[in-house]
Amino acid sequence: LRMSRGLGDVYKRQVVPVMAPLTHDGQGNMLNTNADTIAGETAKALSALFDVTLVYCFEKKGVLRDENDDDSVIPEITRAEFEQYVADGVIQGGMIPKLENSFEAINAGVSEVVITLASAINNSGGTRIKK
């Protein structure tokens, strides 16, 4: 919660923090932590004080039913649908941890998660995960 208050103060000043996904193991060794995990953990911490929407930007329009068809965006996905898509081989690779982080964030109090193109961040496209 201490981190939440510190970031909350930054947010209240209308400053946008930029965070690198670098962490350490407590033994002096630097680690390159998954950026989605850092974003998710930050969103979870802030959700204790604010209404938070977590946006994951990447090179596709959203979570796709067919990775070869950029227009096959799944507009909204539930945990059960996600698990079925994984079992069916529709969702695989790097999208699995991105969605796992998304559901963890929702379960921890984040209001909504959006997965979309960076250029589409201000419209209603992409894939949405809600409470």
Task: Tell what function each PLM region has.
Residues 16-20, 55-57:
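Structural motif
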Residues 47-64, 112-118:
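Glycine-rich phosphate/pyrophosphate-binding loops
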Residues 121-131:
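Short, basic/aromatic-enriched C-terminal tail that caps enzymatic domains
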Residues 12, 44-48:
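Short, conserved, surface-exposed binding loops centered on an aromatic residue
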Residues 1-11:
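Single conserved hydrophobic/aromatic residue that forms the stacking wall/gate
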Residues 18-45, 73-122:
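Polyanion-binding loop/helix "lid" in catalytic or ligand-binding cores
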Residues 9-14, 22-23:
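Glycine/proline-rich, flexible active-site/cofactor-binding loop segments
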Residues 29-30, 65-68, 125-126:
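Short, well-ordered secondary-structure micro-motifs
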